Amino acid sequence: MVKISVVIPVYNVEKYLEQCLDSVTTQSFDDIEIICVNDGSTDSSPEILKRYANNDSRIKIISQKNKGAGAARNVGIENAAGEYVYFMDSDDYLNSDAFERLNGFLDDEPDFVMFKISNFYEDGTKADDDDYYTMPYLKSRVGKNSFNYEDVSDFALNLCVCPPSHLFRREFISDIRFPENILFEDNVFFTQALFKAQNIYFYDEFLYNRRRRLDSTTTPISVRSIDTIEITNMILDLCKKFNHENHKKELYYRIFHNIYQIFKRADESQKPELFDKIKEEYIKSSSKWENDDYFTNNLNPEYKHMYNCAIKSGNWKQFEKCVDNYDSSLKTRFNRLRKKLA
């Protein structure tokens, strides 16, 4: 059995694909197979894959219609033969000894290994280290010891969910899949893996280099950002399944506060579509939330008000005015109270 199956979803990355494949095929640890899932590319990516496959028998190409990264990774899992599975993005690259270093953990048969990611810009310059990708809080908590969810429960949902930051035992993820046709699917996959795992290691080294193709401050807000609601509902279901419902406060914060911040940051031209999607998702989730004791009895009143505004408003302007009027009312009451206490 091959030791590591490397799964690479590929979609229109002709500019970056060679660097990605070179970093995998030249690894100092070579007991690997490389599963490239061509996810309906329309550029020269398929030709690049064929050229590399002709020169390296470890490369397997699977082609499908465009279904997104989650579906492509699932196909990779189903075709993997390795003892461990690694998910890589096709516009990034690995350090040359990444798998050799990770192999040092595998005698203990961990469910998965986590490690640090370095970010870089288009011009090749290194971005400042980001705690989300370097996880210093995880290092200080677990060090070099094996851990599980219970050891990190207070910040479990703030761990890095990026697939390239983890190496999974294939048998361990045999019943875990990425949600398909939706953004932020890696949140659900990682959360289920974290809740299920009993033997996790953190390797405090940079092994992977993640490309930042566009500054987030210039990225237009997409209606797909509202996928956060459906994804968070899936995580709420996992919390219930694994009896980890202590995360509800944080998850409802994402559903309401974070979603409204996305809406407020959007250009006015985007707000009608964003509002329609928010309202659609809130209505679709209403029976689930209204039967949840936390939502009914403990939810922040501001979030409950926002929910009601979305359900009752007929357009985005009514929604924004409804929510903002509540915020203004709170500020007015706070200022009055502060004057009385002065």
Q: Where on the chain are the PLM-derived regions?
A:
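Membrane-interface aromatic/basic loop that binds lipid-linked glycans or pyrophosphate carriers
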Residues: E268-A342
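Short aromatic/hydrophobic "clamp" motif used to bind/position activated sugar donors
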Residues: V85
